[in-house]
Curated annotation (Swiss-Prot):
One of its GO terms (molecular function) is flavin adenine dinucleotide binding. Conversion of NADPH, generated by peripheral catabolic pathways, to NADH, which can enter the respiratory chain for energy generation. It comes from Salmonella paratyphi C (strain RKS4594). Its cofactor is FAD. FAD binds at residues 36-45. NCBIfam families: PRK05249.1. Binds 1 FAD per subunit. Belongs to the class-I pyridine nucleotide-disulfide oxidoreductase family. This is Soluble pyridine nucleotide transhydrogenase. It catalyses: NAD(+) + NADPH = NADH + NADP(+).
């Protein structure tokens, strides 16, 4: 006799991964509930991660653009804005995103339950509601999409009003003149751009020997140079010994013997999965030291009826990939298998000022693989559209096979890089000989556009062949 469950599936978390899973499930006729511990849907991506930080970056980049534009150089004063003013812009975007995503669930008759969930047994959850009551609910299957949070080492006092992580920095309540950013990963570099763009002194502490080592080295070097040129002080191969919070700021003692003092500290070195409150031990699931779950190609955990997607499974930890992971997991959950899969070359967008975006292999990878590749480059300063809008800083680089002309990687540094990259990505994904750098020579681009960089880079690369 079939078991009677409250739901066919329960999704824990309403970020990109949870949303992708929930929408995929209801579209296939499943009875679905989504549990969200926050008071609004959207998860960390919407409320204290991707959306607010990118809204901040956009506002700051527009201020920089105004102050550097020769059209306004006759003005006697620079345009400035407080951190609080810029946060208001981010709040407006967050509210729009929340209303839109709430509408998705309502239109698709997907139930939203608010509170904190943990497992009682393999098919039962306890839901601690915000009013203090506790409910139990059962489901045949589950999708864990509870995201991640900033890593907090035990010897750093995050309760101090001058010490922030990448979540709490969005509630910055004073106007710093000098900030220390510990951790030069994607989040650290993005906030270094934001603060420097607001004319705040920035010390960027990097525990490694170069910035964003997973990038093509030219892109990493371009960012390093741009930071240096704008006044960001980068300190490589450094680790903290002790962090002291005081009334007027923060003192950081480095293991190298150096001491730094600033108005505040942003600790942005690592993240951990939000799995510690799920009581996974009650169902026999274990996480790694970062609170992350291991899954197979269909996003099943060690328990076949429990799936996991998004930051909680680690790499690539991208909102874009998390949504697709949720969609694939939903297909596998209902049909027993998934015909869809993540693409091999997932694009990376880093929202520094200027942006960086990459897809495919780097020069270092191709050299190590002994692939006979060639390089085509286009400098933004040579493009009419870039000259018109004053976006002269930047480059597009295409890596392609010398013999087959197949595009192997595309790397872009400059404003709108995360948009520009998708043109090349679309060609890279073509099958049956469609992936060729010659496409960019044989097609017609609108003029003037930034997309024209592909034609310039393609000609540059093909001219190197002999």
């Amino acid at each position: 006799m079939p078991h009677s469950w409250d739901y066919d599936a329960v999704v824990i978390g309403s970020g990109p991964g949870g949303e992708g899973a929930a929408m995929g499930l209801v579209k296939q006729g499943a009875r679905v509930a989504v549990i969200e511990r926050y008071h609004n849907v959207g998860g960390g991506c919407t409320h204290w991660g991707t959306i607010p930080s990118k809204a901040l970056r956009h506002a700051v980049s527009r201020i920089i653009e105004f102050n550097q534009n020769p059209l306004y150089s006759d003005h006697s004063r620079l345009l400035r804005s407080s951190f609080a003013d810029i946060l208001n812009h981010a709040d407006n975007v967050i509210n729009q995103q929340t209303r839109m995503r709430q509408g998705f669930y309502e239109r698709n008759h997907c139930e939203i339950l608010q509170g904190n969930a943990h497992f009682i047994d393999e098919h039962t959850l306890a839901l601690e509601c915000h009013d203090g009551t506790v409910e139990t609910l059962t489901a045949e299957k589950f999708v864990i999409a509870c995201g991640s949070r900033p890593y907090h080492p035990s010897d750093v006092d995050f309760s101090h009003p001058r010490i922030y992580d990448s979540d709490s920095i969005l509630s910055l309540h004073h106007e710093p003149r000098h900030v220390i950013i510990y951790g030069a990963g994607v989040i650290g570099c993005e906030y270094a751009s934001i603060f420097r763009g607001m004319d705040v002194k920035v010390d960027l502490i990097n525990t490694r020997d170069r910035l964003l080592a997973f990038l093509d080295q030219e892109m990493s070097d371009s960012l390093s140079y741009h930071f240096w040129n704008s006044g960001v002080v980068i300190r490589h191969n450094e680790e903290y010994e002790k962090i002291e919070g005081c009334d007027d700021g923060v003192i950081m003692h480095l293991k190298s013997g150096k001491k730094l003092k600033a108005d505040c500290l942003l600790y942005a070195n690592g993240r951990t999965g939000n799995t510690d409150s799920l009581a996974l031990e009650n169902i026999g699931l274990e996480t790694d030291s970062r609170g992350q779950l291991k899954v197979n190609s269909m996003y099943q955990t060690a328990l076949p009826h429990v799936y996991a997607v998004g930051d909680v499974i680690g790499y690539p930890s991208l909102a874009s990939a998390a949504y697709d992971q949720g969609r694939i997991a939903a297909q596998a959950l209902v049909k027993g298998e998934a015909t869809a899969h993540l693409i091999e070359d997932i694009p990376t967008g880093i929202y520094t000022i200027p942006e960086i975006s990459s897809v495919g292999k780097t020069e270092q990878q191709l050299t190590a693989m002994k692939v006979p590749y060639e390089v085509g480059r286009a400098q933004f300063k040579h493009l009419a559209r870039a000259q018109i809008v004053g976006m002269n800083v930047g480059t597009l680089k295409i890596l392609f096979h010398r013999e087959t002309k197949e595009i192997l990687g595309i790397h872009c540094f400059g404003e709108r890089a995360a948009e520009i990259i998708h043109i090349g990505q679309a060609i890279m994904e073509q099958k049956g000989g469609g992936n060729t750098i010659e496409y960019f020579v044989n097609t017609t681009f609108n003029y003037p556009t930034m997309a024209e960089a592909y034609r310039v880079a393609a000609l540059n690369g093909l001219n190197r062949l002999f």
